[in-house]
Amino acid sequence: MKKFLNAVIVLIAFYSINIISQDEVEEIVVTSAFIDTSEINNPLYIIDGTEFSDGATTSLGDAIDEYLGVSIADYGSAVGQPIIRGMSGPRVKILKNGVVNRDVSGLGVDHLNDVDLNDISQVEIVKGPSSLLYANGTIGGIINVVDDLISTKNFEIPEVSVGYESQSVNDGNSEFVNLKGNVGGFNVNFGYKNTDFGNYDVPSGAVIHSEEEHHDDEDHDEDEHHDDEHSEEDLGYINNSDFAVEATKFGVSKVTDWGYIGFGIDNLESVYGIPFHGDEHGDEHGDEHGDEHGDEEEHEEHGEERIFSTTDSETFSIRGSYNVNGSLVNKVDFTYRDSDYSLTEAHAEEEHHEEEDHEEEEEHEEHAPTVFMNEAVEYGATFDISNDSSTQKVVVNFVDEDNSIVGEEAFMNPANSEEFTIGYYLSKDLGTFDLDFGFRLDQIERSGSVSEEEHGDDHGDDHGDEHGDEHGDVDYYNIDDTTSSFAIALGRDLSDNLGISLGYASVERLPSSIELFMNGPHMATGRFEVGDPNLNSETSNNFDITFNFDNGDFYALASFYITDVDNYIALIDEEDDHMDEDEHHEGEDEHHEGEDEHHEDEHDDHGHGNLIHANYMQEDAEFDGYEIEFGRSFDLGSGELALSFGRDVVNAEFADGHYVPRINPARNIYSLVYTQDDLLFKLMLKDVEKQNDIGEGETATDSYQMLNTRLTKTFNGLGKGELKVSLFANNPVSYTHLTLPT
């Protein structure tokens, strides 16, 4: 399938009021449970928060997609799950202020990362397994979103920021207001942002459905199939690409000589559509096996099917630091977080008459909603035992997390995870080299169950009993294991302008609850996904080397890495089994073609013939790749012009020689940035190459180019405030070709 993203023209008016001006610029440092400076020598990006506030409102993945080694798994405008060096899912962790963000994005590729990007200080991206200093099992890396909701420093001045954003491509708008100040010795922080984006507009003929045929005898359906495609192409927009979110946060902190303590509350509610969802795949096969013309008439009567998700999350956090100043322990940093998250996925028929919109969810009661819930409690402490010769820290952390899925698509029984971590970090100047070392032990216990479905009686004569005894035995599992991981890095300056860093890491990851206990239909992906409670832990061994050169005007960076993963876990489609199953059901449909439509739907639901069967399986794999970047800055007029070129490549193969599925293609990124006093102009061209190294059952992804540009102007002299205006266009001239999940 292909889609064309129309140009996005956005105007952001950002007005901030400072009672007095600030001349000091705060130093940007890395934050985590282990380290609070940029001492560790590994591939790292620190992105200033203004890059997000001055740009378009997008998903987290879209916002960081232009950085080398980082790409996204796109599932509509709301969902863009980050990929780091080809690794995704549980191998990449999203953190908020150094603590893992525990939503349900790991329970489905169509679930968004529940992170509020309003008024953030910075985003830190650590690539590779050396990010184990932040969280367990991070073979791919981490993305840490940092804000000052619980401020570690006193707000010296009150500050009010308001902003408005408009996007033409989706007739959308966004508004925000942020308040900061010191009230009675307490730092108070409040933020609110409301976003409402409609469906993405596209030119007529831009959306093309190219479903794969699974039978050789289906040629007679082609004309009908093309008629369906034509109706989709003339829509003028991408159906179910809308997105609305309302985010509120409030924090209070107290800073004294002995340290600080504070609390914060985050609440986020959203509604978003899921374009090109898996039910389209299923419905097409349903047409092929059943009443095609009846379905067409129903389609004309009820219109397009809408699949959408609503989310509601609330997080309560306590964070603080106590200066012990003892002979062994200098200070103790502590955190507590209670997360309550729910995502409801529902289906409805979109009516052709606007006055009937409120009846959408009543039209098809058979599409009962599915509710994904996650409740987690996490607390930890970091003990600073540094001395004059080295930086040393010890961390302990505990997590208790419950996942549950209730409803029609409950493809996993409730599961519980308990994790206890103890870790150690050391940074020391050895004279010739700078040494960084991290080690952690994680004791993890996962409890869950798998319901075995009985299909033997489904196709018998006694159809009335199918719903009465749908599931067979329930097998309960308790997996208790201890994983160990470590990373070591050596850095050295070869000259005043050239530095080198060598890193080695071994990271062990216990399979996630989904990989262990999944067993059911996942309609949004069009698959019947099956986990395996007997999966072994993944173990990755990574080596990377990075060269940095910077003489002021010219800079260059080259990073090369290789990662061997023992027992790599991947979701593998069973194409042959799916075809056999379809043929089996086709024969049964012919045998029972006189039976009513209700029985036919019942048959498909229990046989899962419309879904691709996919299993979580293990095999050794090797990932390798590189990232190179070089640039030059010039004085131009009264400003500065900076030009840069970057390229990232990742290759991934299993031990038997076939390619790991869903690996992002190579990219070339060209950048132009011009700055002059209060003016900033950015132009970025992303050239993505064709991906031919595909997994079994996948199709090649075409190359494409994406051009993004932004102009930001800051107006000062407005009393005690300033006005910032940004005008930008994303992909104004280029076609974007994406292979969407089937």
Where are these regions (language model features)?
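Conserved C-terminal beta-signal and adjacent last beta-strands/turns
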Residues: 8, 21, 182, 241-248, ...
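Short acidic/polar hinge/loop motifs at secondary-structure boundaries
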Residues: 100-129
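Surface-exposed extracellular loop regions of Gram-negative outer-membrane beta-barrel proteins
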Residues: 340, 443-457, 461, 465, ...
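Gram-negative outer-membrane beta-barrel transporters
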Residues: 432, 561-565, 574-576, 580-583, ...
